[in-house]
Amino acid sequence: MEKTVTFYINRTTPAKLEEELVICKPLKRLTISVDVEKEEHTLMGYLVVRDEKNRIRIQKMLGYGERTIVIARHAKNTTIGGVPGPIGAGTWKIVIYLFAEYIEQTLEGVSLPFRIQISDRKTEIQETIGKCLWVDRHYREQLWLGYYNKSSFYSSRGRWYKGDFHTHTHLSDGKESVSSAMRKARMMDLDFYVPTEHNIIPTGWEDDYMLILPGVEITTKIGHCNLIGIDKMPERLPEIMEYADTPEVEEYLYEILREAKKREWIISINHPFLTIWKWKYGEVGLDDITCLEIINDPTYTDARESNDQAIRYLDFLWEDGHRIWGIGGSDSHNLIEERYKGSDKPSIAGDPGTYVFCPSLTPELLLKHVKQGNIYVSRFCTADVRITSQSKSFFPGDRMEDVERKIMMEIEIFGNELEEGITPVIWIVQNEKRIKLTTEKTKKGYRA
């Protein structure tokens, strides 16, 4: 079985392109090869394949990964983002959703061929789902992560666990393979990692050495937000991909955020003040937001100003009585040897690190303590935060009874990379007022 489909893409091409594929008899596999003139042209869009029962069998931004994609019976032979299982006879659909942001930036006055070759040939691929399959084989039209275990146990220690809530790999537009990204994550001493690809759901992971918490970055022209701890594909995600650059996207984003709240996923607003990617959607209620990304890829050229704005905005929200928690995200898209203009450091998972205190480490407990606000975000240093009152200990985010009480708070900051001659400035919000604390140097760091 062989078929070639060619799409010609320019700025006026509809955002959704679809071609039917008739499979006359069951196959062992479906092999899809993508041919473009330049490697970066694979960033033009998402590939979605639906089977004879209209079930999604793969969803992936073509990006920097392998240009040959395989759907097979088993996870070990199926490309990341795929759903393994039988290749049944009937009418399948090959769908391309164009990534409007890339089209707008690069395709002025040109039309590019986008060629897809489909066959049942056996082909070796490197980027397979791997050891851990999350997607339920008894899937419906939407993807369900029915095999993901939120009770998986990773550590019995009560401590601060370091992780990254905003990451990218070959599953969307990141330049790192999943394997390479995980090596870097271990190098950065991460305890947990959240894959948040642009409008793409991870269907599994290469191994379970580290706690991996499924997420997705809902990506539109009116802002980006992460949904963290998802157990299924958001119902309106296909419409988000199709209408991301149109006024209609507001309705679909509203529905996704309602679904996220109903299913108790974490909603985190990404880089809320970052140039063209700032948050512009005004219909979301502050009570619906769990987290605000206050440090997004600090190595990026425009990061300093936008991150400072995000931190100050979170202070304002706290002063106004809102309980929204600050988290960080590397938002890393690059290889470790690459640098943004003006930076001498790589954009890498774990920079910044977000630390979450958990009594032990499971996905379920991690989600619980993020929602409680037992969090701090850090770069180059760690913190020891001690809060006591009436002989009880508390963590950032914990609630105390609404009574008059004496509260003792001590914060110590440690780090070999703290710049010499620079003293950390520490503020707290107390009774909805921002207060600066006195800081002193110690043998190991600083204390307030």
Give, region by region, the residue ranges found by the protein language model.
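Surface-exposed beta-strand/loop patches in noncatalytic accessory domains
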Residues: 2-12, 35-78, 118, 122
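Exposed aromatic-hydrophobic patches
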Residues: 18-21, 71-72, 81, 437, ...
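Hydrophobic beta-strand segments within beta-rich accessory/binding domains
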Residues: 19-38, 83, 92-97, 104-105
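Extended, low-complexity, turn-rich repeat/linker tracts enriched in Gly/Pro/Ser/Thr and Asp/Glu
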Residues: 36-43, 100-104, 416-420
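Beta-sandwich interaction modules
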Residues: 65-92, 99-101, 448
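Non-catalytic propeptide/linker segments at domain boundaries
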Residues: 87, 95-161
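Charged catalytic cores and adjacent phosphate/nucleic-acid-binding surfaces used
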Residues: 122, 135, 142-156, 222-234, ...
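A metal-dependent hydrolase metal-coordination microenvironment
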Residues: 146-270, 275-288, 294-314, 335
